[in-house]
Amino acid sequence: MKFRILNTTLLFLVLSSCLASNIPNPFAADKNTVRVSIDLVNVDDDKVRVTVVPPELKVSSIAYQFPKIIPGTYAIADYGRYVEQIKAFDKKGAEMKIVRTDSNTVVIENAPKLGKISYLVNDTFDSEDGSGTFSEKGRTIFSPAGTNIDAGKQFTLNLAGFVGYFTGYLENPYQITITHPTDIYGTTALVDSDKEPQTDVFLLPRYPEVVDNPIMYASPDTAKFNVGGMEVLLGVYSRRGSVHASALRPDLERMMIAQKKFLGKINNTRKYAVLAYISTGTADDAQGIGALEHNSSTSAVFREPMKSKDLIHVISHEFFHTITPLKVHSKEIQYFDYNNPKMSQHLWFYEGVTEYFSNLFQVNQGLIDENRFYDLMAKKIENSREYTDKLSFTEMSSHILDPKMKRQYPNVYEKGALIAMCLDISIREYSQGEKGLLWLMGELSKRYGPSKPFDDKELIPVITELTNADVGEFLRKHVENGEPIDYDDYLAKVGLKKEIVPFPEPIVFVSQGVNYIKADSTNTHVLADVPDDANAFYKNLGIEDNDVFVEFNGLPIDASDLSSIIFLGYDLDENTPISIKVNRKGQDINLKGTVKLNYEDGDGYRFRDDTKRDLNQNWLKK
């Protein structure tokens, strides 16, 4: 795996004169190959030039399309709306007539004469409008599926935003040539078949592989290691230089060792790339925090101050996608229609099982203790109540692109994970602890596989066949029919009892519903608001009323954006070092110490039934 990028038409012409035996003339290559050139050197007004040479076309009329949606996103993207100045030229260089039938589609007559298509691509990061990906009217492309163009510095290439397909030619091979400045490199799971320092050439067997392989170009900030025969590449870009791959590598390596051990023979991934973009959170930068899974990589967006545990939480989820949907999936995913999609019924399976495993493996491998795992599940129960509990998950999944259904999507990470938990417990119970959900995934991967999808309607009957009637009844009642689940009942099977437990509050500036920060009268400074001494975080560091926040762990406070300081105080770890600079009565003061979190009591679970210890330990540890 190499981290470089490609060149454009000019380089093609130069190289063709010097290396004619290796670099064919643009119109004399393999007749079946779609050849794409992406120019990251000559960026025009924050736009990138793309040139596409078609395969041999034998139809009278051809459509060139950009995806309306891509796998794993569950929201309409319409990548074509970021493409402009589309032109078609015949093989002699004369411009041809085109008809743009919608934002994603260009139709060209006299297709056999087509020599190339050329267009400019805008990026998505600096146009995110705050409407959200999953709001009813939101049109923002989820940042990890988006694109970024920062000339000479950084490019995020989710290739669906740059490269389209010719209708009827999805299965044709692609040659993607990318020209880039020599001082930036591309992190990707792809192998560069070119040795030139300014050019990368990637060969892909079909269009779905193009969409499945993101590339991130930036000044080199990478780490590489091997886990159980799997090569892992981490690439990091931070505009402010606040995060580096070397700092994230130890925890990422520790986590991936644990994941490979947890999965055992089910996972046979040979190469895996992690592309981590660290957003400043400013209006012209990525807003959507999270990640998008691919077969051999993950594209992720984080926000400052980003910690290694943020990477672990996100990447642990995405890596488990190598099991589902990447290995076990329905025909709707295998034969994905990028412009007229039919969505699968089984988001609970693809996202819920994955999210559950990303939590379970941590207690299974000793990365967290049992009570911490119980608390994570309890929070999911609480969070799931923000959504419609009686909604059929199969109905929601198949209609997830309906604007009125979109707001239910985040529940796949809450109730979806809880469905997986209850399914795991049910399998453990009937098998007397010998089998669990991971065993079931192994059996399904044997029956199906990356190139052998299942029919949506057969998944639950097949799971019933592999397990027992009670498991099938659970899925029919709670997944298909949407009956609420009695979580207390299922957790009691493994010895847990509901009780009041203290939970850390997620933001140190808010406790018991009280805000402990405010803007001054001119909205130019962010101040501490200390109406009482109940905030343990403030009390421990000696923060006083009307202290002006200047820096938080070395990061400057953006007074124009109150949310930025709230984010700085989010999800901190108890007893970790912290430094806050405040201005108190005209004098800067550095307050140093350790994090003391605020806690709030809530419904949780603890192990209280010793007669269930064996089943409990088989559930958590086997």
Regions found by a protein language model. Give the residues of each.
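Juxtacatalytic substrate-recognition/specificity segment
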Residues: 221-346
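C-terminal recognition in membrane/secretory proteostasis and scaffolding
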Residues: 358-359, 367-622
